[in-house]
Amino acid sequence: MVKPERVFISIDMERISSIVDWEEVGKDTKEYQFARKIMVQDLNAAIEGALDAGAKEIMVSDAHGRMRNLRPEDVHEAAVLMRGSPKPDSMVEGISEGHDAAMYVGYHSMKGTLNGICSHTISGSTVQRVWFNGRETGEFGMNSALAG
């Protein structure tokens, strides 16, 4: 079994542990600081998992909203954090052909998903549907296609 040495992690916020409502992920809400705390805990758990699997290099892309949710000093020291926008490749900024694995943490269901929590695709107010190679897809599918 080949161990993934170079791992890329894209982390969104809407489906991190215990998040169930839009009020928790909007930067101007009182619940946002709680969501940021949980977001970094989920991220650091994913980083630990990648390290346990043999990762030697880990790149993280803060992928929620304006992409400034994670404080660098809170992120596991084994990872390199990319944050802020604009990013040409948006949620997967920093991924390259040299990465052996991609992880998607906190990703949510696409817009229109029955009973999906915080379902949307890119921007719920402007994007209604995205089709890729004849299939409707959400952020996970779009970013996986970019990742290769």
Language model feature labels by segment:
Residues 30, 34-61, 67:
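Alpha/propeptide regions of enzymes that mature by internal proteolysis
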Residues 21-34, 120-132:
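A solvent-exposed, charged loop/short amphipathic helix patch at secondary-structure junctions
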Residues 17, 67-70, 110-116:
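Short, well-ordered, mixed-charge alpha-helical segments that flank or form enzyme active sites
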Residues 91-147:
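Internal, conserved structured core segments that host functional sites
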Residues 65, 69-78:
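Glycine-rich loop at the start of a catalytic domain that most often binds anionic cofactors/ligands
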Residues 10-11, 61-62, 102-107:
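Short beta-strand segments
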Residues 7-25, 35, 39:
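N-terminal glycine-rich anion-binding loops that anchor highly charged ligand groups
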Residues 75-95:
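A glycine-rich helix N-cap at a beta->alpha junction
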